[in-house]
């Protein structure tokens, strides 16, 4: 049975989206919902695992960590890349690394939620509403404003399209 450590699941996403019981015949899972104290703690707690399933870039998967996990065979990351993984060290140890496809719609939506929240003072308005006040501030329209973006990759280009739909002038810098 392959021993799999699920790291950095601070929001218990693995329970919500995956039925781990269906996989229990072939895999033994342990979910780490809290960060490790330090690298020595990570080495101690992960020593017996053959696979690390890592979420985002929270725990650095360093050369030292990889070199000290003798049973490690696989590193699986959410997303197509993870800058927290020392790829050269993994390659040297012949640890297989794989990722998942990612849909950037959620990131784009969150970006626009935050922009709209700032433009329309959502936090202040919600706080005031709970205190019995209604429409205490005036936000501003996005139409005609300049949206500055650094990077026009997959997320930036989607954010730019929505900015144009709001009638904004989009200015961007990208390599």
Where on the chain are the PLM-derived regions?
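N-terminal glycine-/charge-rich "phosphate-binding" loop or analogous flexible N-terminal tail
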Residues: 1-51, 55-56
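Phosphate/diphosphate ligand-binding glycine-rich loop within oxidoreductases
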Residues: 49-126, 130, 139-140
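Short glycine-/acidic-enriched loop or helix-start segments at secondary-structure transitions
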Residues: 15-17, 41, 62-65, 84-87, ...
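Hydrophobic beta-strand scaffold residues
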Residues: 29, 96-97, 170
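Rossmann-like dinucleotide/phosphate-binding beta-alpha-beta segment
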Residues: 137-175
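Phosphate-coordination loops involved in phosphoryl transfer and adenosine-cofactor binding
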Residues: 1, 72, 143-146
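Anion (oxyanion) recognition and catalysis
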Residues: 23, 91, 164
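Cofactor-binding loop segments of dinucleotide-utilizing enzymes, especially the Rossmann-like FAD-
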Residues: 7-9, 34, 80, 152, ...
């Amino acid at each position: 049975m392959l021993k799999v450590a699920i790291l950095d699941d601070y929001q218990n996403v693995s329970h919500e989206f995956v039925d781990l019981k269906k996989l229990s015949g072939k895999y033994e899972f342990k979910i780490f919902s809290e960060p490790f104290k330090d690298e020595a703690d990570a080495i101690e707690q992960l020593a017996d695992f053959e696979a690390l399933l890592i979420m985002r870039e929270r725990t650095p998967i360093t050369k030292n960590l990889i070199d000290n996990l003798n049973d490690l065979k696989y590193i699986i990351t959410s997303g197509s890349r993870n800058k927290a993984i020392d790829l050269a060290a993994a390659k040297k140890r012949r640890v297989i690394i794989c990722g998942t496809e990612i849909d950037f719609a959620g990131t784009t939506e969150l970006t626009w939620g935050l922009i709209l929240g700032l433009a329309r003072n959502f936090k202040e308005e919600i706080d005031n509403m709970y205190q019995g006040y209604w429409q205490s501030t005036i936000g501003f329209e996005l139409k005609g404003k300049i949206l500055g973006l650094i990077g026009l990759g997959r997320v930036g280009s989607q954010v730019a399209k929505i900015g144009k739909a709001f009638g904004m002038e989009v200015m961007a810098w990208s390599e």
